Amino acid sequence: MALELLSPAGSPEALRAAVQSGCGAVYLGWGSFNARRSAKNFSDEEFADAIRYCHLRGVRVFLTLNTLLTDRELPLALDAARTACRLGVDSVLVQDWGLFALLREALPDLPLHASTQMSVFTAGGANEVYGDGCERVVIARECSREDTAAICKACPAEIEIFGHGALCMCYSGQCEMSALIGGRSGNRGTCAQPCRLPYGFNGPAKNTYPLSLKDSCLADRISDMERMDVSCLKLEGRMKRPEYVAVITDIYARLLREGRKPTAAEKADLELAFSRSGFTADYWQGRHGPAMFGTRPENTPEPKELFAAARAKYEKDDARTVPIHFSCSCQAGQPVSLTVWDDDGHVAAAEGPIPEPAQNKALTATDLEFRLQKTGGTAFRCTDGSADVADGLFLSAGAVNALRRDALAALENARCAVPVRREQDFSPLPNLDCTADTPTLTVSVTTWAQAEALLPLAPARIDLPLELLAERDALPDFAGEWCAILPRVWRDRNEPQLRTWLAHAKKLGVTSALAGNIGHLPLLRDAGLTIRGDFGLNVFNSRSLDYLRRKELSSACLSFELRFPQMRDIQKLIPAEAIVYGRLPLMITENCLVQNETGCHLSEAGDAVPQQAPCRKPNDLQDRTGAKFPLLPAYGHRTEIQNSTPVWLADKPEWKHCGLTYARLRFTTEAPAECADIFRAYQTGAPASGPFTRGLYYRGVD
């Protein structure tokens, strides 16, 4: 299958720019449930017109419904998908597990694409969503050429990659920085882009931007994608100007069409259209580091000449035409007939009046062919045609024009015909109730010293990183449950090591594991451990819990973007958990922020982070207000950024009345004795003794 070029359409004008510049498909937002709610997006009428405009010109339309949804919003999102399906949309991109399951049942013939917000970066994850009905998977921007090739080889789904545009610092779908700092959720389409602000490393914020990545540009790596059977190359930019969309689409379309790399002039135009101190292709090449980062000054001038030329081209609306062919018969005593067809198998026909005997000059085949070839003002371009005209006949110019107009209108309708798709009722949620009267306290730790300090207090469960468990030959005596925390991010090449560690953990007496990614599930099924869903799965509604129940999870942690009433109203189809104490994770990043500052090379020795690594020492980022965000090392020499202050709810009653089975205390930077004190405070309901936040449990997110 040829590599599809997918362009952003943040507005009707941007859509026209993309189509006229040569894209194969567009993705757009309609309604409130898309990950770029700040884009202009489309009204109801504009959305219907957009689908017809695109389909007429052979361009597919993908609707983004890729945000997390509450129980109250799910029916509205389903209605939007039903309407889009009836209008002929070609696919819907989804993030929310509940909406995914709902759409697959209610609209079984509607193609679904797994949005990059599903955080898929392994073949196991891709196969999980493919097996549940996603025909295409948009993999993480951080995937390298080798990662992508492994996924393409091992998964039958179509694989889509980001080829050009902005790079988020955090793995998409896992970023909570905008939500927790300002209440604007990236998972709900309102990210405030705090990654573009200045931060200081272990000191006050200066004019440094350690979270601001350059835009990606893979224009000269297209042949790589084609060799490994990538299905779609996606251009990012629904928030950008239509002229920007036109420029980048035109260049990438040319490269695909001509099978070549970009010229120096084309690279310059891409950079002129928009860049942040240049471009990067480091993720694709399996690299990371300081060279990937850049900024764009606010006073950067607009490329007026480049944009004016692009605008002039797409405003003519005639660059993208459909080649057609015709055959006409004009015989005495019979209505004149015209058949037109395109190269995609669509055929249409029209009839005109019976030709009259010629009084003066008779109609010739050459004359009729010349008139029928005039398709100006339409989306069609006649490449060839023939007319069979009997001698001595006359047909008025008006009749010929009407005949051509009717035939082209019929062909347009054929090209824009809406496919017949089934619409079904969806099943009610099962009559299950795992609501608990009072939650039991569980703990997660990052060090053995923390775990040992908590053992005498008898939490119901202790969650430890799998890497820590791999270091031990035996576990301390503990009446509760030992639970392994799998790395939040890993790659297919890491799975042999993870499987070895899981087998070792099971021998030690570990009985369960936290799955924070859909790709964890095949690993944990094979390991024979009880699977508990972690916060990375973004459980936001009852249908998501039901989806995970059917995936045989024994419990799941609810999203910490939910307010307590929303948490309470979720039907507990499996035991539910919430994080009620701790520094909440803001980001998980492919770049090691400490390595970028110190020049450490320990990543060359393997993916496990050694104890002597500089990232094991206390490090933080400091913003302009003086808030300090601790940096913790993550498997694969990645970084997890923690919130500046911990959530404290020991003195609040609401979390005890949400039907939760488990309430988790998440320990990260705390000293062992501090962990024990905090656990006791939650047993007694004590107030906080230091700075704290209530998280989003009261204020919620936009």
Labelled PLM ranges:
Residues 1-21, 25-36, 50-51, 57-67, ...:
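Surface-exposed amphipathic alpha-helical tracts and adjacent flexible/coil segments at the periphery
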Residues 90-91, 99, 108-112, 120-124:
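N-terminal glycine-rich cofactor-binding segment that shapes the pocket for flavin-like pterin cofactors
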Residues 39:
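A short acidic, glycine-rich active-site loop
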